[in-house]
Amino acid sequence: TAAPAAIQTPLQRHSYAAGIILSEGIEKSLRLQKSLGLEVDKNALLAGVNDSIAGSRKMDTKQLNENYEALAEKMSEKEKAAYDRGFATLQSTLSGKTVLKQNQSMFFVEKKKGGAAIKNGDKLTVRLTQSRLDGKAVAPQKSFPIVYSDSIPYVLNQAITLAKKGGTVEVYCFASDMYPAEMLPSSLVGFDLLKYTFSVSK
């Protein structure tokens, strides 16, 4: 274990911040492995980080590649299985509901039928609820004004268009459909199932 470092000079602060950011990437990988049911030996992992920085690796390049590729293959298999299970869950959850549009694993579902179609320049208020499929909130409910145009983000554009004025649309999807990998919140993994509810009013 490295000795405690003084964090006083600009160089020390910059270096410390770099270390924290690096560790956040490692923690994200560990959370994914745990969610896939894979065990991790944290002591060995930290030893690998320290040995790499110190230039004293205990494996040659061939051994490193073989072991890392074996882990990556195992993670890939389990992740694919998790996505397959999730897609099946989405399909069973949406059975009997009115699916207005499907884009791969993203489903736009009618909850409340709207009235007039929405046109460019319309001023609207959108109420958004974000939750997991089991109903647990991912973020606080919020309402926001918007001027409708073709340039607003895809999911918002489609939800508003399909909901129409006075309507409500639910969007069911994987977390990875909504977030790029580098922006995924720490509380989520890519194959978590989410539900977004968009209610549109004037």
Give the label of every model feature segment.
Residues 1-202:
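Cross-family detector of peptidyl-prolyl cis-trans isomerase
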